[in-house]
């Protein structure tokens, strides 16, 4: 019996040394991009007329919602006004939570008023205690709302969690409660969006992966991080040589708009992966760069999208500056210059509640001060 033990001791010492040297790097705590460490911009005195509204009613029911494209053909590109109104009404409390948390975190990181932080924690804590949004009775629109809300909340939470001002230090019990809930939502989101056939993987899967990535970093869950990276790679490998996503081309007149909509989650995931030593920029021959360049070109001249999708493009969304919030992480990844950089500067600052709020303050804070 002793001989194997001696052999083990002899070979294990270098192995243990290697583990000590490299194992730590492999399991280092997950971190966000550098901009999330920013402290409170300028501490203000007084309440600034801030009033904490009552938290929206936690949504604990079945996640069964009507789609705004109800009755549309397989392109899912024609809005149904009646079903969209019903969708907005039934998801109103969820959207109020998303937008409210994003706004209050932004206010707090700007002004540092304790009431702003307390109100944010009250809202999130109320929903966490209720176990909101965790129903396993859902349809496609329902599971979509779950991952959108998770991305909004975890995206905002990261700004509090990693800020050099350490706003959560005095609220650890509440923070733990909220993070446990976010983790449960992320775990359910993984179940919701795993193992889909390729023809079903589109922007929804990318947004799901962003929500899981944001939560992974907020809660230091390497398994969730790995899942988000895996989903990113699937998405990147869907981008063809011309920079098109075949499953978004199916949206016909809204193909360009949906290519643009696919970019924010993909760019954020790649940015967060890079912060943790995983470089996804070159995946599928620089697919993310190709996708972004194609959308920017299409916004100027949509004829290539019209030719590929077979329909004249609906440019409504492409005229809204905030729809290009992906430019912040994308330009941080690919170092935009010239015309692209100029376009980004013209449209700043970018604020997207689904990405956790003020994206420009995170990625290009000096630009915000110029506005």
Swiss-Prot record:
Give one GO term, molecular function aspect: poly(beta-D-mannuronate) lyase activity
What does the entry list under GO cellular component? periplasmic space
Protein keywords:
Lyase, Periplasm, Signal
SUPFAM superfamilies per the UniProt record, alphabetical: Chondroitin AC/alginate lyase
Q: Where does it localize?
A: Periplasm
Its Enzyme Commission number(s) read 4.2.2.3
Catalytic activity reported: Eliminative cleavage of alginate to give oligosaccharides with 4-deoxy-alpha-L-erythro-hex-4-enuronosyl groups at their non-reducing ends and beta-D-mannuronate at their reducing end
Provide the leader sequence positions.
1-28
Q: Which residues form a coiled coil?
A: none
Top enzyme class: lyase
Its GO biological process terms? alginic acid catabolic process
Q: What domain of life does the UniProt record list for this protein's source? A: Bacteria
Residue numbers binding substrate:
67-68, 140-141, 258
Q: Which family does it belong to?
A: Belongs to the polysaccharide lyase 5 family.
State the function annotated in the UniProt record: Catalyzes the depolymerization of alginate by cleaving the beta-1,4 glycosidic bond between two adjacent sugar residues via a beta-elimination mechanism. May serve to degrade mislocalized alginate that is trapped in the periplasmic space.
**Record protein name field:** Alginate lyase
Q: Which organism is it from?
A: Pseudomonas putida (strain ATCC 47054 / DSM 6125 / CFBP 8728 / NCIMB 11950 / KT2440)
Gene of this entry? algL
């Amino acid at each position: 019996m002793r001989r194997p033990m001696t052999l083990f001791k002899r070979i294990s010492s270098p192995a243990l040394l290697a583990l000590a040297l490299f194992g730590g790097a492999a399991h280092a705590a997950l971190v966000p991009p550098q901009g999330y460490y920013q402290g409170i911009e300028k501490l203000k005195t007084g309440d600034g007329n801030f009033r904490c509204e009552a938290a929206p009613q936690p949504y604990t029911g079945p996640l069964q919602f009507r789609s705004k494209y109800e009755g549309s053909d397989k392109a899912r590109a024609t809005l149904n006004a009646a079903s969209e109104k019903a969708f907005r009404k039934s998801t109103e409390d969820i959207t109020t939570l998303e937008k409210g948390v994003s706004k209050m975190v932004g206010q707090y990181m700007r002004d540092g008023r304790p009431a702003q932080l307390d109100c944010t924690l009250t809202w999130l804590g109320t929903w966490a205690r209720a176990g909101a949004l965790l129903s396993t009775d859902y349809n496609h629109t329902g599971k979509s709302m779950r991952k959108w809300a998770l991305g909004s909340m975890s995206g905002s939470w990261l700004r509090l969690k990693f800020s050099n001002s350490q706003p959560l230090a005095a609220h650890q019990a509440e923070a733990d409660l909220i993070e446990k809930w976010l983790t449960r939502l992320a775990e359910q989101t993984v179940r919701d969006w795993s193992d889909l056939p390729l023809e079903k993987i589109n922007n929804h899967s990318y947004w799901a992966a962003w929500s899981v990535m944001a939560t992974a970093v907020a809660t230091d869950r390497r398994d969730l991080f790995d899942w988000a990276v895996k989903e990113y790679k699937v998405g990147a490998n869907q981008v063809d040589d011309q920079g098109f996503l075949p499953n978004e081309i199916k949206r016909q007149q809204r193909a360009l708009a949906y290519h643009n909509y696919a970019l924010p989650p993909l760019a954020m995931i790649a940015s967060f992966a890079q912060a943790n030593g995983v470089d996804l920029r070159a995946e599928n021959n620089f697919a993310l760069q190709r996708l972004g360049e194609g959308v920017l070109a299409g916004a100027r001249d949509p004829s290539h999208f019209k030719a590929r999708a077979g329909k004249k493009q609906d440019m409504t969304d492409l005229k809204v500056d905030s729809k290009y919030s992906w430019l912040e992480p994308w330009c941080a990844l690919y170092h935009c210059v010239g015309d692209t950089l100029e376009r980004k500067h013209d449209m700043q600052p970018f604020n997207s509640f689904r990405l956790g709020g003020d994206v420009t303050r995170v990625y290009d804070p000096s630009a915000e001060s110029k506005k």
